[in-house]
Amino acid sequence: MFPFILFPLIAGVIAIVGYRYLAKRQPEYPNGRVIATFTLLGGGLGGLLVTFLIYLTVVINSPSPLIDDSLPQRFLPVSVLLGGGIGCAPAALCGVLLAKEQLIRAWKSSLIAAWYGVISGVVAGIIFLNIPASLFFAPIGALSAAILAAMVLPKAE
């Protein structure tokens, strides 16, 4: 139970400190929207992607044409909550880094966001002191960051 309380608190601290730092230096950029969206939705989206991977594994490894796909459907709320609880701190870090760079909605920005997602995922794995977890969290963080960047970053003027 301890990490589920600690990670959202760390995410809140990262988001608030990052916003206060950036609001003074770049008031024209929507820092709050980018940081808040990444903090609140990044981990949950990662949990949703994990559920999708589990569903693909069930479908691919099913020996019969009648697939019992109720497992991923039952696991979806738990996965989103776990992803939101554990992944909110790396997602907040990614959101602060993207807001600091003042990125706009473009494919290059999505690639940069994916790179920051990889870095944040590796940091999350290192926090767990588990290198295989880093290898699992990195691509999930990259894909989650790229998807959110395509939706949240401001459009070019």
Named regions from a protein language model:
Residues 1-157:
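Juxtamembrane/disordered regions of integral membrane proteins
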